[in-house]
Amino acid sequence: MPPPLASTTSSFASDGENYLGPVSATPHLMCERIVDAILPSSLPKGHHRRDERKKDIEVFDIGCNDARVLITACQKYKNVRGVGIEIDPVAANNARNNVRNSKLENRIEIREQDAMTVTDVHRAEYIFLYLLPKGNEKIEKILRERMNDRCRIVCYMFKLPDRLEDDKFWSKRLIKEVAFDDSRKRERKGVDTSRYNRIYVYGSKREMERREKIRKIVRAGVGVAIGIVLRNSMLK
């Protein structure tokens, strides 16, 4: 049985200063795709026994609704621990019940909390966001200030915005954008309104530094190769 869906309308005023968007659950098929995008495939799979030789991976879901993304991640990978932040009390209660029913209480923590007041986001190595553009605009400031150098972020549906045109902080970190024709496993024929649903993957600071080093090595290698070709052509 899939986890119950929380109400689609938040019980908090939509014009509040820290309002990030309505309560809305990620489709189950997209949960699987998001987990595959956010976590390395080298992690030990299965959720019954941890691999003591591997360190735990901290995943934060900001606006976690009924915790289905965190549950999917912990069920697929042994060494994943999750923290779900949810301001809506109904959704937070559903999340706790789903975590309990999945027997993952020792690995997933659900907080009924305003996401703008989270002070330990620096613990996260992976962060998932399914927020409206206005919500992404608000939360990105906190992520910039508090996330650690190893943190990778995955957004569903909407990108993280750059603050200024000449800033391009998030645009530079966008390493993957994947579009999916269907967000649900469909048992009946019908019109799918989710043809443009996308996942946006943002690399960590360390990832970007490694990529830049590789680019420099490749450029240097190409330069050397061109130099050799030119020199040989001149000797002929």
For each feature predicted by the language model, list its residue ranges:
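Conserved class I S-adenosyl-L-methionine
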Residues: 56-65
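Conserved SAM-binding loop of SAM-dependent methyltransferases across substrates and taxa
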Residues: 68-78
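Conserved SAM/SAH-binding beta-strand->alpha-helix loop
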Residues: 88
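Conserved SAM-binding loop
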Residues: 95
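C-terminal substrate-binding/active-site "lid" region of AdoMet-derived donor-dependent transferases
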Residues: 135-207
